[in-house]
Amino acid sequence: MMRHFYYTIQTLLHERGVNIIKIISMTLGIFVGILLFSCVAFQLSYYNFCPQSEQLYVTYMDGPFTYGPFSAAMRENFPKEVEDATILRDMGTNVFYNGNVRLTESTIYADEHLFSTLGLKLLIGKAEELTRPDVLFISRSLAEKIREGNSLESVIGKTLSVDREEPMSIRGVFEDMGENADIHFDVVVPMSKLWNLARGGWGYDISYMSIIRFRDPAKDIKAVEARIPDMLKKYMADSSNKKKSHRFSFRPLLEYHTADPTVRLMILMMSVLGIAILLIVAFDYVLIAVSSLARRAKSIGVHKCCGATDNSIFRMFLTETALVLFISVLLTMLLIFQFREFVEEIAGIRLSSLFTWQTLWVPLTVLLVVFILAGAIPASIFASIPVTQVFRRYAERKTSWKRPLLFIQFAGMTFILGFLMVVFCQYHMAMNKDLGYNPERVVMGWKKLGSNRQNAKSFFMNLPMVEEHGVGQQAIWRSWSGEVFNVGEGRTIKGRFEWIGDDFVPMMKIQILHGKNVTSPKEALVNEEFVRRAGW
């Protein structure tokens, strides 16, 4: 074994020019391949940090949203099938103040069953306190920011004010969620705060995410779905009206992320691109290695004259490939570390989340595939050289096997270039597509104005850099399941509902095809899709 290793080192040093090309080619290919397949594995691992995550299901109506009281009704009506259930609502990013320190944190509304349902570890506090509307639960990472060098327990009882207006007391600290989740939050606001505002009733406000933990999903889900119509009769008098859709279904939380067609397409593209790059790298190595066949044939014949068998030659060339691969891996690690910030920005994931012990099999699999493809083919070719080649000049007779390799090389490069052109065209289209409104020179901020809306408008319009001002409840591009609308003849449709001021439409340069802008609380604007679905 040591003799094989010695011969391999000598060969690598003797042909260092060619080997440098091999190492550079393989390093770049492994670098891109590992990142692509690690991103794919990350996308497929969403919510696997939840204990017994296969028991967690999301409630769907038209989308993954439902009525506010739904989870509580599930716990009450199906105690044998439902182990626990929680309801939550995304609040986006909110501003909190710890004294004079400004904190911008992702926030959700949730009930006291959030932690027990998802299996999130509650480090400090009691979940039951989430029934109080004046409390907050925060993540460990946020607690680290505000504990000021003291223990985590010291944050309990501290007050965070929402926009310097509404003080709320910290009553619990929970463990940080993994990055592989669509629902990110560092602050939990009690759902009772919304209930006190008369939000989230039956038959309206379909904007809540209900997550159910079933005891035995295989048999419980079908039984529960069959009994839901009877349950709804207790809470909604018109639930049996056939013209009003109240269809409920449950889908695994583990599939919630990949249910998005955009995510599935991204996974497919990264997988195909990764496979193409690895094949190109492996066969590029094979072609470079085999191009030295005529030159190395005599030395292989000498080895065989000295007693080396075909297996010995095969192992020697596998060792050579392994050494080149090892050096390439070291350089790949150096590249990843050197361009850490760039990689994290492009992938949108921290490297500590992308490369974990649970996903270590991904880069190892990539390396194994490259090693087998790049090592086995040239090793078998070199091992088949007869011992008689030591006595005469080696002339390669069969070259037909090179053509498939060259075809794969050119086909792979053509595919990658074509793929990049398609991506460029899509990017150009996305950046220049007519959105139906004009976002240029528009900035936004979130603030509860209430009766001060006119004062706020006067303040902004008096600023010399402000041309127009408008107000709305949410950003114009936000999309979620919304309200139920009665469109006549006993029919209902569901759609997003947005409160806006009369200055919003002209500011965003939204074109009104028919009618006029809203001027009173009893008027509304609808888009063409709403008209189509309503059948008007």
Where do the language-model regions lie?
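Small-residue-rich transmembrane alpha-helices
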Residues: 35, 233-234, 321-385, 425
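Intracellular coupling helices
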Residues: 5-17, 281-324, 384-394
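Mid-to-C-terminal secondary-structure elements
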Residues: 111-124, 138-262, 458, 462-536
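Membrane-helix entry/capping segments
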Residues: 1-5, 9-20, 50, 227-276, ...
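Membrane-proximal extracellular/periplasmic loop immediately following the first transmembrane helix
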Residues: 36-95, 102, 106-108, 203-213, ...
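Short, strongly hydrophobic transmembrane alpha-helices
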Residues: 7, 11-45, 402-426, 437
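Short juxtamembrane loops and helix-capping segments at transmembrane helix boundaries
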Residues: 44-53, 186-189, 193-195, 250, ...
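Alpha-helical transmembrane segments of integral membrane proteins
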Residues: 21-32, 267-287, 320-332, 362-367, ...
